[in-house]
Design a protein with these regions (language model features):
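Nucleotide-activated chemistry modules centered on ATP-dependent adenylation/adenylyltransferase
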Residues: 1-4, 9-392
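ATP-dependent carboxylate/acyl-activation modules
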Residues: 390-473, 480-500, 508-521
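Structural alpha-beta junctions
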Residues: 52, 132-136, 243-247, 416-423, ...
């Protein structure tokens, strides 16, 4: 049996358990993918002491960085927020090597330490069976029914050294892209995990240096190639950034997520390099892309994250996602300066030959290429749907002749305002309403074309849902030519636009009462 061996509680217990339960020889396989907190030689020797007939460590750091993490960088790897997928990205590589070593060693079975409640069983077994449909797989944690306490007791009973204790029951998954912590208080979202006891590679943010550090990353076609001007292989660059970011407490995340199997859980993640790189990459990518490209790429990145998290590394659809992502990253070249301090990484400067940023256009500098006078028309069209949607609040035009009629309709107008009617009024009516404390918008006469808002414009654009147009009594008050003209146009446009129009005080009162009754009934 080829056992994917991490040296932790689960795989150490099962190395002994497989020998006893299956009477099988065990080859312990540890893959070096840049573990930050583990001594892999110590782990190899431990496997031999526990009875493995062979224990090997495969150096796959460059393969992991260049063929797996690289895809994640281009896709701004994340799942449901700030989990940068350190474990899911690594699992296909582990499964691939397990199948490969099993073939080399003549083993027909591989084993892993995943539980039946987790996602890793899907990622490892799905990949292994895709690569070799005939491989046998055993998952002792699913079979033996032991919890963490029982495992620690089993380890004590059989003399298996483990670092977990009752007071520190935490388990870890570790690679260069991040460290995942589980167990203890982490599993209960109601508790605050004691970071001082849990963190493996990051300083506590509050204990990190008070002075910020500027990290300059150079990117070529979406991938970082240099730190502060020094060219590096991707694996070495990631490991170097882990030290820088870890010192400043960058990348510590309490993350509640939805597992593939349907459970909602919390993990505690440390991913200093991932946090810095993705912050830089995302900002550079945004800088060289159009708005439409950025919007679509964000959607693709989410799909990428869900696909990897769910264990579908070899799904054909995943190839299509990567094809688009690779194409989009062809122009993502340049340098980004990232400021790191006390748990925070923030891109603060970007330079690239591929930018579509134009300083004169984007700033307050003078420019003949951008016609600012075109903005008014653009805004009117751009906000059309929003403005139309807000017209669900009805509008009413009030043009009421004689003070006597205005006084008679004061309560009626108050009622319209309470029903959220937006009130527009011609000059004398507006003046009366202002004195009575009723809010209304002044509408200028048709003859005053230069003054806005103008009555004719609003009638032409069918802006009113109700018109109360009560002319002055010719026997009591002389009517001007402008009033006669405006009144005539109002009535004509009301008929043309099929707008409710009232020309008498009593009808106006009755109509508003009916509107109130209908509103209450509704």
């Amino acid at each position: 049996v080829v056992l994917l061996y991490s040296g932790g509680l689960d795989t150490s217990v099962m190395l002994k358990w497989i020998q006893d339960e299956y009477n099988a020889e065990v080859i312990a396989l540890t893959i070096d993918i840049g573990q930050q907190a583990d001594d892999l030689e110590v782990i190899r020797k431990k496997a031999i002491k526990l009875g493995a007939i062979k224990a090997m460590v495969i150096d796959a750091k460059d393969e992991f960085a260049e063929e797996y993490i690289s895809k994640g960088i281009k896709a701004n790897a994340s799942y449901q927020g700030y989990y940068h997928l350190s474990t899911p990205i690594g699992r296909p590589l582990l499964a691939k090597w397990a199948v490969k070593i099993a073939a080399i060693e003549g083993a027909d079975t591989i084993a892993h330490g995943c539980t039946g409640k987790g996602n890793d069983q899907i990622r490892l077994e799905g990949t292994a069976l895709t690569l070799n449909p005939d491989i046998k797989i055993i998952a002792p944690v699913r079979e033996w029914g032991m919890g963490r306490d029982e495992e620690m007791e089993y380890a004590r009973k059989h003399g298996i050294p483990v670092r977990q204790t009752a007071s520190k029951p935490y388990s870890y998954d570790d690679n260069m892209w991040g460290v995942t912590g589980e167990g203890g208080e982490i599993e209960n979202p109601a508790l605050i995990p004691p970071l001082k006891d849990i963190l493996q590679v990051c300083s506590l943010p509050e204990d990190a240096p008070n002075k910020p550090e500027i990290v300059e990353l150079e990117f070529v076609k979406g991938l970082p190639v240099a730190i502060n001007g020094k060219q590096m292989k991707l694996a070495n660059l990631i490991l170097a950034l882990n030290k820088i970011g870890g010192k400043h407490g960058v990348g510590v995340t309490h993350h509640i997520e939805d597992r593939v199997v349907g459970l909602k859980v919390r993990g505690l993640y440390e991913a200093p390099a991932a946090e810095i790189i993705i912050e830089a990459h995302r900002n550079l990518e945004k800088y060289v892309s159009t708005r439409m490209e950025n919007e679509f790429k964000s959607e693709i990145d989410i799909k990428w994250g869900y696909t990897v998290y769910s264990g579908f590394w070899y799904e054909p659809y995943f190839e299509h996602l990567n094809a688009y992502i690779d194409d989009q990253n062809e122009k993502v070249s340049g340098t980004v300066k990232v400021r790191v301090i006390k748990g925070r990484a923030e891109a603060v400067a970007v330079e690239t030959p591929n930018t579509i940023f134009e300083e004169k256009l984007a700033t307050f500098m003078a420019s003949t290429d951008f016609n600012q006078n075109a903005s008014a028309g653009f805004i009117e069209l751009y906000t059309l749907q929003m403005r139309l949607a807000q017209r669900s609040e009805k509008t009413a035009l009030l043009s009421i002749g004689s003070r006597e009629n205005k006084m008679k309709l004061k309560k009626t107008i108050h009622a319209l305002a309470k029903m959220n009617y937006k009130l527009y009024a011609t000059y004398k009516t507006h003046k009366f309403l202002a004195r009575e404390g009723i809010e209304a918008i002044l509408v200028n006469k048709i003859s005053e074309e230069s003054k806005k808002p103008n009555l004719k414009d609003m009638l032409d654009s069918n802006r009113f849902d109700l018109i109360i147009n009560i002319p002055s009594d010719p026997d009591k008050e002389e009517r001007s030519d402008k009033e006669l003209t405006d009144g005539q146009v109002i009535r004509q446009m009301a008929v043309k636009n099929n707008v409710k129009m009232v020309t008498s005080v009593e009808v106006a009162k009755e109509l508003v009462e009916k509107l109130q009754a209908a509103r209450v009934k509704k």
